[in-house]
Amino acid sequence: MANEKLDGINPTRNELLNLKDRAKLSIKGHSLLKEKRDALIKEFFEILDRVQGSRDEVEKKLAIAYSELNKAQIDMGDMAVKRAALSVRESIELDISSRSIMGVSVPVVKSRATHNDVLSRGYGFAGTSANLDVAAKEFEESIKIIIELGEIEKTIIMLAREVEATKRRVNALEHVIIPRIKNTISFIEMRLEEMERESFAQLKVIKKNIDERE
């Protein structure tokens, strides 16, 4: 790899100038890709931190919800709880869009709240327990966080893929493309110097022959 050169390059001055320009662009591209890689990694870990916090919050809310639901079942009876559950009007609405993180398009999912109060859920006060209201509220809030988690985890997957792709491009430039360009530049410079020496030697021979004839 250390001495590998680009294929199909002729040792001419034009090729040398083109390769020097290409080397500058490759080095600049390498620097920009490293910056992108580092920014993506930083963003990746910042978002990753949010995942654990959201998961912990969901677990707490679900624990409260199931505890309150159990209390409601004891207070109201299983059948009454089931009737109340069946009367609830489902109305989860999602707004899905996207945003760009360092050129990576990631999802943005917004949920419009299912229910904001007891009355909007569809079951009445009569024959229901306050524990059921608390359980419903905690379940609804858990759903919102679970939707957010879906957005976050999808974003993490997409960023991880882009980080790996960017790393491969950085490594290719750093360990393959740029070294080959530099090796080819060195080869052409050396070959041009040899050609100049050969040309100079030939000119000396020609001059000597002319001088001898005179």
UniProtKB/Swiss-Prot annotation:
This chain's function reads:
Component of the A-type ATP synthase that produces ATP from ADP in the presence of a proton gradient across the membrane.
Named from the GO MF annotations, one term is:
proton-transporting ATP synthase activity, rotational mechanism
Q: Name the domain of life.
A: Archaea
**Protein's name in the database:** A-type ATP synthase subunit D
Record text on subunit structure and interactions: Has multiple subunits with at least A(3), B(3), C, D, E, F, H, I and proteolipid K(x).
**Similarity comment:** Belongs to the V-ATPase D subunit family.
Q: What subcellular locations does the record give?
A: Cell membrane
Instruction: Give the UniProt record's GO annotations in the biological process aspect.
Output: proton motive force-driven plasma membrane ATP synthesis
Its main localization is membrane
InterPro entries with a match to the protein in the record: V_ATPase_D
Q: Which UniProt keywords apply?
A: ATP synthesis, Cell membrane, Hydrogen ion transport, Ion transport, Membrane, Transport
Cellular component GO terms, alphabetical: plasma membrane
HAMAP family under this entry? ATP_synth_D_arch
Asked if Cell cycle is a keyword of the record, the answer is no
Q: How does it sit in the membrane?
A: Peripheral membrane protein
